[in-house]
Amino acid sequence: MKARLQSLLYGLRLLLATLSLGIGTGLVGIACHYLLEGVQGLAFGQDKGDLLQHFHHAGGFRRFLVLGVTGVLAAGFWYILQRRYKILSIRRQIDLAGDREPAFLAHLLHAGMQVAIVGAGASVGKEGAPREVGTLLAGRLGKAFSLAIKERKILIACGAGAGLAAVYQVPFASGLFVFETLGLAYSWQNLLLVLSSTYLATWVAQPIVWHGSIYHMSLVHWSASSFLQAILIALLVTPFALGFRSLAKRAGRKRRKDGTILWALPLAFLVLGSLAVFFPIFMGNGQVLAQILLSSQSIPYLPLTLAVKGLLVYLLLRNGAYGGTLTPSFALGIGSGYLVTLLMTVVGIHLDPALGMLLGATVFLGTTLQAPLTAIALSLGFTGQSLSLTIPLVLATGVSYVIRMRWEKR
């Protein structure tokens, strides 16, 4: 079989590997979807309402119990796993392509646990898991089709983007993510490989995963005053996003992996569980918090709520949990943009709260991901907004980018 594969034209082998990756990561997206729903159903019951109602109907004691048990199980799992295997990040897998292969089953279980803890209410993102499984699959396909090391690295990067696309149904944004965050060189070949894999993965997963935009909000329009709003939000939200990014990076660097994880991570989950007894809004990856604001509902003590949400993400990641920061960043950006818009109203400047939330989310995402173009595409894709909003979003991310560059040069 391998001899036959090697006999094929190299370009055809690369094409087949890319198509196989798109189909495979689409199936990964479906698996993540069912795993998340299965854990949520097991933990909180089969409720057909929205996610916040799901948490509410479970009751405070059940929320506390689920998070407490999840903390113990997650701590034991990651302690045992990391004693036996080294978890390789996506960037590390790209760097080591052809030299060292990650332990497939260990990394697969590692990704599954990330989805499971989010389903149980952990305050982190789930997006890391499909990206990591996508890179695993890409590495195996690159070897199976006897690709050169250069193309294997490209395929692994494509796997990360395709995994993200399958779960969130945002193929174009996921393609930009590969170029901006993984440093893939811009070329026609790379563009073709990336977009082929992301769009195919999205198409394969769509019948199961797609239920409309992830976040529901009315169509937003912009006017001349939107330019002022974009500049103000970029100036005021970027520093908060820089602070959150710094916390998240520190948590990743200092993440507990030794025996202390066995008490520290369960304790972190108990802190979250104690808050969730009274405030289920803190549970999950931030989707509940963001959707409440996007639905024009108010949240009492919003500044405190955002601060606590950000600290909970740090607390879990620092004490041994793994998970993403993309969706928490989006939620924090939604809240920050809304706050800035309200602040302007107090001083007599009346601006559109809905646009303010989108601007805040884009600025926050662009800063934490260090990927402004990806942030614009994700904000539009997540909320189903029209491309006409690109103009104020570009202005906001441009101003935010200048602030970030000046900050990093200090």
Question: What kind of feature is each model-predicted range?
Answer:
Residues M1-R410:
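Alpha-helical transmembrane segments and immediately membrane-proximal extracytoplasmic
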